[in-house]
């Protein structure tokens, strides 16, 4: 055995992986002494996804050597759905047998209930070298994750794109569709749903509603808040922190 990782909350890897399943065909999981990480571009080169589980935040983590595991997400899609919110997930990598396995069992441990084991061959996946993005952000805010998802769902009713404008004292979300249909929400500095607004001057850009919803629909179950960073007509960065790690998505803007 090369790696063993025990997640105390199975819902955390489940929802994070469900985002990856929606946005990526395949990727490489990297196991090191610091923990588990994944960094990949979506097929359209529009979104950069970065997921980390910290070794110190896992219930148990052992590693013989740094290990890379190629995963085709369609092969694990149905298994991931089987992880209950209160169940534990144990991930095991056996390099000698060239397999990785998921063990799903009750919160109280293997000894007290049914243990479900799913095993898969490790596949060779091309790991694209991704340089650090030289992106600076002129504006940022934090928002209740469920509120952001509700806003995106509202805008999705009328448009494929959402314009986000951050001013020193408020955040405006707006979508305009065919026939002049529009949806708009404004959250001011004293709103109970938005926090820590930071902007020297107004910054605005448009982004794909579908892509943002693919992320927010799952990650709202892991993080109460999401940090949003953007600049005028530049990429947006969403950062979700949760008990065992952090998920970051950087998404290119719409260019009119």
UniProtKB/Swiss-Prot annotation:
CDD domains: PCNA
Keywords: DNA replication, DNA-binding
SUPFAM superfamilies attached to this UniProt entry: DNA clamp (SSF55979)
Biological-process GO terms, alphabetical: leading strand elongation; regulation of DNA replication
Record-linked InterPro entries: DNA_clamp_sf, Pr_cel_nuc_antig, Pr_cel_nuc_antig_C, Pr_cel_nuc_antig_N
An annotated Gene Ontology molecular function: DNA binding
Entry superkingdom: Archaea
Subunit-structure text: Homotrimer. The subunits circularize to form a toroid; DNA passes through its center. Replication factor C (RFC) is required to load the toroid on the DNA.
Its biological purpose: Sliding clamp subunit that acts as a moving platform for DNA processing. Responsible for tethering the catalytic subunit of DNA polymerase and other proteins to DNA during high-speed replication.
Family per similarity comment: Belongs to the PCNA family.
NCBIfam families reported for this sequence: PRK01115.1-4
UniProt-recorded name of the protein: DNA polymerase sliding clamp 2
């Amino acid at each position: 055995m090369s790696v063993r990782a025990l997640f105390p909350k199975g819902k955390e890897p489940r929802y994070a992986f469900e985002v990856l399943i929606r946005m990526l065909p395949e990727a490489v999981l990297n196991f090191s002494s610091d923990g588990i990480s994944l960094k990949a571009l979506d097929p359209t080169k529009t979104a950069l996804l970065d997921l980390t589980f910290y070794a110190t935040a896992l219930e148990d983590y052992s590693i013989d050597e740094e290990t890379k595991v190629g995963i085709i997400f369609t092969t694990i899609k149905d298994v991931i759905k089987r992880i209950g919110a209160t169940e534990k997930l144990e991930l095991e990598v056996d390099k000698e047998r060239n397999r990785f396995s998921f063990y799903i069992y009750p919160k109280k441990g293997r000894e007290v209930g049914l243990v479900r084991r799913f095993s898969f061959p490790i596949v060779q996946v091309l790991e694209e070298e991704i340089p650090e993005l030289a992106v600076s952000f002129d504006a940022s805010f934090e928002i209740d994750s469920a509120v952001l998802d509700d806003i995106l769902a509202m805008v999705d009713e009328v448009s494929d794109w959402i314009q986000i404008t951050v001013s020193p004292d408020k955040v405006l979300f707006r979508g305009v569709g065919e026939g002049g249909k529009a949806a708009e929400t404004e959250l001011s500095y004293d709103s109970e749903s938005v926090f820590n607004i930071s902007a020297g001057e107004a910054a605005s850009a448009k982004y794909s509603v579908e892509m943002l919803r693919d992320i927010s629909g799952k990650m709202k179950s892991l993080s109460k808040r999401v940090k949003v960073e953007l600049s005028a007509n530049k990429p947006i960065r969403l950062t979700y922190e949760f008990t065992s790690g952090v998920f970051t998505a950087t998404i290119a803007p719409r260019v009119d």
